[in-house]
């Protein structure tokens, strides 16, 4: 039971620190507009999946952002290792979170329906 709370606290801490690292340490323009939306960590604390969103709808921007994050993964992981007080820093993987774009698309459709009435 205590392990579950530890994982939750670690997920929140990783999310906060990765946001800070992306803002202050990573200078790659491809990751300039990235927002971290969530983190999931495995039960053994060995792997972390970081979910991110970008405001652009273009597929090319998504690919560039994914490439920029892949290139910055080593820096982000080493910074996390120095900031977190855990035995081993988890392996990081980044996955795009499309829920923000989905939500904005739903809002757009609702607004279009309101205008038609």
UniProtKB/Swiss-Prot annotation:
Q: Give the GO cellular component terms, alphabetically.
A: cytosol
Location in the cell: Cytoplasm
Keywords of the record: Cytoplasm, Ribosome biogenesis
Q: Name one GO biological process term.
A: maturation of SSU-rRNA
The protein's predominant localisation is cytoplasm
NCBIfam families for the chain: rbfA (TIGR00082)
- Quote the subunit structure annotation: Monomer. Binds 30S ribosomal subunits, but not 50S ribosomal subunits or 70S ribosomes.
Q: Which family does it belong to?
A: Belongs to the RbfA family.
Q: What is this protein called?
A: Ribosome-binding factor A
Organism lineage: Bacteria, Bacillati, Bacillota, Bacilli, Lactobacillales
């Amino acid at each position: 039971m205590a392990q579950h709370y530890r994982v939750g606290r670690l997920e929140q801490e990783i999310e906060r620190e990765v946001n800070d690292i992306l803002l202050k340490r990573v200078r790659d323009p491809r990751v300039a507009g990235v927002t971290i939306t969530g983190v999931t960590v495995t039960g053994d604390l060995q792997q972390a999946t970081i979910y991110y969103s970008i405001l652009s709808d273009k597929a090319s921007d998504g690919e560039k952002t994914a490439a920029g994050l892949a290139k910055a993964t080593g820096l982000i992981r080493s910074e996390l290792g120095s900031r977190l007080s855990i035995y081993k820093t988890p392996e990081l993987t980044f996955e795009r979170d499309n829920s923000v774009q989905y939500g904005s698309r739903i809002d757009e459709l609702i607004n279009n329906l309101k205008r038609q009435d």
